[in-house]
Amino acid sequence: MKISSLFLGAIVLALPLSSAAAYAQEVCNRLTEAEVSAAVGVELHRSPTDPCRFGHAFKSFSIIIHPGDGYRFGDYAANARKEFKDTQEVPGIGSDAIFYATNLAVKAKGDVVVISMYLGKSPAERIALAKAVAQKLIAHM
């Protein structure tokens, strides 16, 4: 049986994507609902369909992990600064972090973590909540 090179190429390209998604799900699954609730000050439940999403609608947050992309954080931050005038540095989390719109992007342990925070009434409150979640998450990486 002969395997086409196109099929083999698709498998090779899909493997890193599936392993990146599996890594993100594994890290998010280590983050407990109790840790999340303590970090944000309200009880939140994990989505039954996405281990990286907690809460519902505008009382929620989600996590995206880009494994191994830490070296690209500078480019990521530069693009955010171009697109969002409210982009600001966030000290005290990871090796580098910025906040823009509703997102905290953190460079930690060679990865980039983005937390989209829909809790909090002001940018300062959203930053504090996202930072608290990020600290818990990074401890599980």
List each model region and its residues.
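Bacterial N-terminal signal peptides
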Residues: 8-18
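Short, functionally important structural connectors and interaction interfaces within domains
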Residues: 9, 23, 82-85
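Sec/Tat signal peptide C-region and signal peptidase I cleavage site
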Residues: 18-24
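A structural boundary signal for the start of the first folded domain, especially the loop/turn
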Residues: 27-28
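Extracytoplasmic/secreted proteins, especially bacterial periplasmic and envelope-associated proteins
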Residues: 31, 35, 39, 75, ...
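A short, solvent-exposed beta-edge/loop patch
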Residues: 86-141
